[in-house]
C-alpha cells in the first residue's frame, strides 16, 4: 500500500511539473499516460524498498522548484523544498543530489542585486533542513534503538565496490565480507580507499573510462530497473486471494510476464530518446531546465563512481519523464518556429 501511495503521489507531482513548465495540454496528457503506465505498472512498487518510498518527496522537490516564478521570492516553495528534501534524505541520501543541483542552478543565475535574496533563501534552506533533520533524528532515536555508527558502511565502501571488475561495479559479496572483516572504522576506510586505488590503477586511464561507460549502460539499459536480477525474489503471493487479486499478483510478480517488461522497456527507450532531444535543444538560460539537467547528470555520475544498481535510478524517474516531455515540447516549438518562418518567407 505504501508503495502504491508513494507512486501515485509522484505521478501527481510529475504531471503538475510538466504542466507548469510547458502549459501544453497535449504534452501534459501524454505525461499522464507515461507516468501511469511506467510508474503505476512498474513491479518495484510492490517491494518495500526506499527507492519507491522516496518518490513522492523527490518529485515534490522537483515540483516546488519548477513551480516558482522568477519575479516572486517563493519562500513558501522553498519551505516545501526543505521539508520534502529533509524527509527524502532520511529515506534515501541520494536526494541530496537534487539539492546540490538547486544550489548550482541558483549560483549560475546569481546576480549582484539578488545576493541578499539568495543568501536569505540559502539560510532558510540550510536552517530548515537542519531543524527538520534534527526533529526526524530525535523521533527516530525515541522510537528505535541507537545504531552503531562504527558498524555502518561509509561512502568509501561503495566507492571500492563500484570499482570491482567481477560484477562491473555492482554489488559484490567479497567486498562486503572484506569490509565487515575489519572492526576498526578508520582502518576499514583506509583499506577501502587502498583497494579502490589499486583497482583504478590496474585499469589505466582508458580502461577506467571504458569501465565507467559500462556502468552507465548498466544503470540505464533496463526499463524494469533490473527487476529480474534484484526484485523477483519477492515471489510469494500474500494478502488477498480473490480471483482479481490473484490475476493482479500474477501480473506484477510472475517472472514469465514478458508483456509488461516489453512495455516498460519500450517506454524507457522512448523516454531516453526524448531526453536526448531535451539535451540537444537545452536552453541554459532556463534555470529550471538547468536544475533538471544537473540532477540527471549528478545521479548518473554517482552511479558511475559508486556502486551501480539500476533500481537506484528508479527514484529519479520523475526527472527523466519531465526532461523527456520538455524534449518533446522543445521539438514541437522548433517545428512550429520553422513552419512560421517558411510561411513568413512565402
Regions found by a protein language model. Give the residues of each.
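Membrane-proximal stem/loop segments at transmembrane-domain junctions that anchor or position
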Residues: 142-242
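Transmembrane-helix signature of polytopic, membrane-embedded enzymes
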Residues: 11-37, 287-292
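Membrane-interface transmembrane helices that cradle and orient dolichyl/undecaprenyl
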Residues: 22, 59-77, 107, 112
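Transmembrane-helix motifs of polytopic, lipid-linked glycan transferases
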Residues: 2-22, 60, 274-278
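Multi-pass, polyprenyl lipid-linked donor-dependent membrane glycosyltransferases
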Residues: 2-6, 30-60, 65, 91-98, ...
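Specific aromatic-rich, kink-prone transmembrane helix
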Residues: 13-16, 53-70, 83-85, 102, ...
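Membrane-interface anchor segments at the N-terminal boundary of transmembrane helices
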Residues: 2-3, 218-292, 296
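Membrane-interface alpha helices of multi-pass inner-membrane proteins
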Residues: 77-92, 103, 125-129, 301
Amino acid at each position: 500500500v505504501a508503495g502504491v501511495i508513494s507512486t501515485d503521489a509522484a505521478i501527481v507531482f510529475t504531471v503538475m511539473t510538466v504542466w507548469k513548465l510547458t502549459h501544453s495540454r497535449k504534452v501534459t496528457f501524454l505525461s499522464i499516460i507515461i507516468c501511469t503506465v511506467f510508474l503505476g505498472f512498474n513491479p518495484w512498487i510492490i517491494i518495500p524498498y526506499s527507492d519507491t518510498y522516496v518518490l513522492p518527496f523527490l518529485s515534490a522537490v522537483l515540483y516546488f522548484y519548477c513551480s516558482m516564478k522568477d519575479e516572486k521570492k517563493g519562500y513558501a516553495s522553498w519551505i516545501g523544498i526543505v521539508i520534502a528534501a529533509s524527509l527524502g534524505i532520511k529515506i534515501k541520501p541520494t536526494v541530496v543530489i537534487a539539492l546540490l543541483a538547486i544550489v548550482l542552478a541558483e549560483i549560475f543565475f546569481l546576480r549582484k542585486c539578488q545576493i541578499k535574496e539568495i543568501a536569505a533563501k540559502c539560510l532558510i534552506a540550510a536552517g530548515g533542513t537542519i531543524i527538520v533533520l534534527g526533529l526526524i533524528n530525535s523521533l527516530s532515536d525515541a522510537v528505535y534503538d541507537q545504531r552503531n555508527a562504527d558498524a555502518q558502511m561509509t561512502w568509501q565502501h561503495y566507492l571500492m565496490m563500484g570499482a570491482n571488475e567481477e560484477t562491473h561495479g555492482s554489488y559484490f559479496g567479497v567486498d562486503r565480507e572484506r569490509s565487515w572483516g575489519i572492526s576498526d572504522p578508520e582502518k576499514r576506510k583506509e583499506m577501502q580507499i587502498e583497494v579502490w586505488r589499486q583497482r583504478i590503477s590496474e585499469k589505466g586511464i582508458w580502461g577506467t573510462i571504458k569501465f565507467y561507460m559500462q556502468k552507465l549502460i548498466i544503470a540505464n539499459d533496463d526499463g524494469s530497473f533490473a527487476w529480474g536480477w534484484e526484485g523477483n525474489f519477492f515471489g510469494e503471493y500474500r494478502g488477498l486471494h480473490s480471483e482479481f487479486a490473484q490475476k493482479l499478483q500474477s501480473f506484477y510478480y510472475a517472472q514469465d510476464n514478458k508483456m509488461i517488461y516489453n512495455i516498460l522497456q519500450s517506454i524507457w527507450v522512448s523516454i531516453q530518446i526524448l531526453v536526448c532531444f531535451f539535451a540537444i535543444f537545452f536552453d541554459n538560460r532556463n534555470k529550471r531546465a538547468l536544475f533538471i539537467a544537473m540532477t540527471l547528470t549528478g545521479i548518473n555520475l554517482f552511479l558511475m563512481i559508486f556502486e551501480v544498481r539500476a533500481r537506484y535510478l528508479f527514484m529519479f524517474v520523475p526527472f527523466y519523464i519531465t526532461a523527456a516531455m520538455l524534449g518533446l515540447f522543445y521539438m514541437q516549438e522548433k517545428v512550429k518556429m520553422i513552419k512560421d518562418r517558411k510561411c513568413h518567407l512565402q
